[in-house]
Amino acid sequence: MKLFFPALLSLGALGLCLAASKKSVRWCTTSPAESSKCAQWQRRMKKVRGPSVTCVKKTSRFECIQAISTEKADAVTLDGGLVYDAGLDPYKLRPIAAEVYGTENNPQTHYYAVAIAKKGTNFQLNQLQGLKSCHTGLGRSAGWNIPMGLLRPFLDWTGPPEPLQKAVAKFFSASCVPCVDGKEYPNLCQLCAGTGENKCACSSQEPYFGYSGAFKCLQDGAGDVAFVKDSTVFESLPAKADRDQYELLCPNNTRKPVDAFQECHLARVPSHAVVARSVNGKEDLIWKLLVKAQEKFGRGKPSGFQLFGSPAGQKDLLFKDSALGLLRISSKIDSGLYLGSNYITAIRGLRETAAEVELRRAQVVWCAVGSDEQLKCQEWSRQSNQSVVCATASTTEDCIALVLKGEADALSLDGGYIYIAGKCGLVPVLAESQQSPESSGLDCVHRPVKGYLAVAVVRKANDKITWNSLRGKKSCHTAVDRTAGWNIPMGLLSKNTDSCRFDEFLSQSCAPGSDPRSKLCALCAGNEEGQNKCVPNSSERYYGYTGAFRCLAENVGDVAFVKDVTVLDNTDGKNTEQWAKDLKLGDFELLCLNGTRKPVTEAESCHLAVAPNHAVVSRIDKVAHLEQVLLRQQAHFGRNGRDCPGKFCLFQSKTKNLLFNDNTECLAKLQGKTTYEEYLGPQYVTAIAKLRRCSTSPLLEACAFLMR
């Protein structure tokens, strides 16, 4: 692993200053074989003078979750299904390191859940009723959650409170599902090979437990189908001739060879992960232990002890035998982000009633950023008779994360955030189309979206300022990572100065979302009580287009980076708030890139760039339903809707631009631009990618890890 792991280990070692003395990681084990390996690991770590590891004996992974939560243990490696359970109340554990699979040249932090059958048996995935099945274990990803989620339409099951196990026991003629209560569901333990109390045990004491065990159940002829992962058959059968006796069952009810798992699988599943407490979890110490252990006992090391290996006759003790190593997981990633919405939806679908599943599919969960948006969203929800319901987060990135986890479905984003959301796998659904003199309300939904102009605004009286003399001036921004307020002007400035030190180029700023201690937040004011200073939501009075212009209008900043209509919307009586009611359009001018200045009304010939309109984003599986719901809502509450202004208006706000821009005429179709790259355009995407060298986004970094 010369190419891969030295770089991997050096990343993890940075910034780790914890003294190993008097500190120990208590690793949780679930069988005598794991306890034996853990004890050997403990002795080996002492020899190399690494961080101390001690071993805590439990009888199941679930007992380990409880022990870690109550601070009686510190770490254990879990399958994705148990990562989900561990992340719930009251445990609140989070994944801190992911197992890496694949090859040195193509390392992966995921695997594929597959269904395998012997060649010549001729049944398909939709013909499993009455057959015999082999599973890795109850509640595990590849062996239970994914296949049962896929088979739910075929099960005679209305959902809780009736146990899923009861429906599965009726569906298959016999099974081996380790970890099931064999007394209550004898049919689900009928095929298991353990003896006495070990029959159907939730550990390697049951010979058919885990991936290799479930495949052995198929090999031995006990079962007709095995639910395992893509690498299981390769690990169990090194010879291709032997593997050729088996086939994959595909979701489209065909079969493929076992090496075609990328085209024929039940789901893409995140790899097993080490979990720890989310508070006081010894995360740095655990990672320091794992770094040293990989360095000394990892894949390809000459030591007699192998961290990712098990003695003859044993499999997957403490870690998967197939793991190449471990990658540290960003602190931004909780269990929901790690697992992703598809996997979580599968799990929830197996725990909810049919009515609950249908309600969740029918509703749209809108994500509101901050308390002001939450209030507007709640009113929308009431007026829509719960067709739309609300989730809330304090920042736009946190809302994007909720959509990724399936805890929300959509929100409307500025182009800069569309870039981040797109990099995380979300897609645009509908675009905000603004009013213009040539607009026609009748064709707004189908009219191509024009985009808007990003501009730099100054007070007319401050006549010495030009685009070329901004160094040392005070600036007002909509928010970090937003298009007109940050990405476009900062991209141009970094290109001109070849520097990313914006806090040195500008004397002071209000750029919501920056470090509150930095000069980039020095001009921010927070709310009327002085709280929430520099937060990237409407609790910061200088946030957004209107807020950035207010920062300029109140003589706090010298220049405001906004869009072309911002000044028009807030002067000459258009905005009746106290701070804006006396502002005159003629008191402001635009800075042109050639060093001249022009009236605000001449933005067409004096702007920084053309920016893509805001757009609604969601997960790809929600696009069709979301578009249908939003167009229906728009017919009621849009600018010309039959219930606006009588009941509620989507495109009006008590404070400016909540949920959508107030000057939105309609939500328009995308004209075939269905990916973030197509919607934003190649020039904008390239510009953002270059600007990314100047700043980091925790969510972007998290998504880069998750999408690897």
From Swiss-Prot:
Keyword Transport set for record: yes
A Pfam family: Transferrin
Record InterPro entries: Lactotransferrin, Transferrin, Transferrin-like_dom, Transferrin_Fe_BS
PTM: Poly-N-acetyllactosaminic carbohydrate moiety seems to be needed for TLR4 activation.
Sugar-modified residues: N252, N385, N537, N594
Enzyme's top EC category: hydrolase
Gene Ontology BP, a term: proteolysis
Domain Transferrin-like: 25-352, 364-693
The entry's keywords: Disulfide bond, Glycoprotein, Hydrolase, Immunity, Ion transport, Iron, Iron transport, Metal-binding, Osteogenesis, Protease, Repeat, Secreted, Serine protease, Signal, Transport
Disulfide linkage: C28-C64, C38-C55, C134-C217, C176-C192, C179-C202, C189-C200, C250-C264, C367-C399, C377-C390, C424-C703, C444-C666, C476-C551, C500-C694, C510-C524, C521-C534, C592-C606, C644-C649
Major location (coarse): secreted
The protein, known as: Lactotransferrin
Subcellular location as annotated: Secreted; Cytoplasmic granule
SUPFAM superfamilies associated with the record: Periplasmic binding protein-like II (SSF53850)
Location of region: Interaction with E.coli ompC: 44-51
Sites where the protein binds hydrogencarbonate 2: T478, R482, A484, G485
Residues at which Fe(3+) 1 binds: D79, Y111, Y211, H272
CDD domains reported in the protein's UniProt record: PBP2_transferrin_C, PBP2_transferrin_N
A GO MF term: serine-type endopeptidase activity
